[in-house]
Amino acid sequence: MLVLGIESSCDETGVAVYDSESGLLSHALHSQIATHRVHGGVVPELASRDHVNYLVPLVDEVLTKAQIRKNQLDGIAYTAGPGLIGALLVGSCFAKSLAYALNIPALAIHHLEAHLLAAKMETPSLDFPFIALLVSGGHCQLIEVNNIGEYRLLGDTLDDAVGEAFDKTAKLMGIPYPGGAVLANLADQCLSTPYQFPRPMTDRPGLDFSFSGLKTHALNTWNQSEKKESDRSEIAKAFQQAVVETLIIKCKRAIKESQSKRLVVAGGVGANKALRSALQKWIKDIQGEVYFPALEYCTDNGAMVAYAGCLRMMRGEIDGGLGVIVKPRWPLA
């Protein structure tokens, strides 16, 4: 079964071809960082226009790489939400139109579900159930995953998502967009820090998160410093240490409460070196299992959408009708 996957929820255009028998055949990605850098953040209108410009060439590229013709496709999966409504509409309209022209099913995929299943795409032996830590620019959640479509929300952020907190803190310290990754690199390169930041919401029960106060603490520390490059690096390290330890504490609680020792990390922040290292060390200590997608599949991509679509299609779940429905806000559980 051959499925074309289309990701256009925000500022990256991702396209891929997935085969139920051979796995991922090809994928391509266009990042819009250069487009949005001058504005200091993602501009929704520009994001939509970029998707329009790059979607067709990327589809042609992945089909050529996979040596597949359009009429060989069995289905087309597209991200239907959550995300920027204009960006979602570009991908969904294209997918629905092509599916109609080819007389094949279109599959509306939840963006977060695609992230949760990305690790399973590379490790088919990964069995349900498992606990998922979903950490990205727009989300920070702990989710119990019992099967495809069977999700229970254990904890959520009350304000900023992890990636959002990284980006905003970087901006407050004068690091240009996209600053979150730069902030993490500064933290990794810094050997030690004199600062000790709070671990938010770890002194109370529950699995919810809050990072807005940590962001404010970083800003106050920066303003009270001499604002040298060494100060920026030391504050970055203290900030990252606080975020990572907070996530670890919450993961420990989730694993203990669920009595599962299988953890999956999903989303763009899952590429963070410090987080990966800390989770691997802890999970080894409890003789558990932790799964990460490859770095290229942590951030938004078409491969995870194609894979999720293939799984859904094999279960007989396809879109009905030709109406294009996208959901900018769409809870997973």
Curated annotation (Swiss-Prot):
Residue positions binding substrate: L134, V135, S136, G137, G138, D167, G180, N272
Enzyme Commission number: 2.3.1.234
GO CC annotation, single: cytoplasm
Alphabetized UniProt keyword annotations: Acyltransferase, Cytoplasm, Iron, Metal-binding, Transferase, tRNA processing
Database matches in Pfam families: TsaD
Top EC class for this record: transferase
GO aspect biological process, one term: tRNA threonylcarbamoyladenosine modification
Main subcellular localisation: cytoplasm
Cofactor note: Binds 1 Fe(2+) ion per subunit.
Function: Required for the formation of a threonylcarbamoyl group on adenosine at position 37 (t(6)A37) in tRNAs that read codons beginning with adenine. Is involved in the transfer of the threonylcarbamoyl moiety of threonylcarbamoyl-AMP (TC-AMP) to the N6 group of A37, together with TsaE and TsaB. TsaD likely plays a direct catalytic role in this reaction.
Protein's name according to its UniProt entry: tRNA N6-adenosine threonylcarbamoyltransferase
Taxonomic source organism: Legionella pneumophila subsp. pneumophila (strain Philadelphia 1 / ATCC 33152 / DSM 7513)
Organism lineage: Bacteria, Pseudomonadati, Pseudomonadota, Gammaproteobacteria, Legionellales
Gene transcribed to yield this protein: tsaD
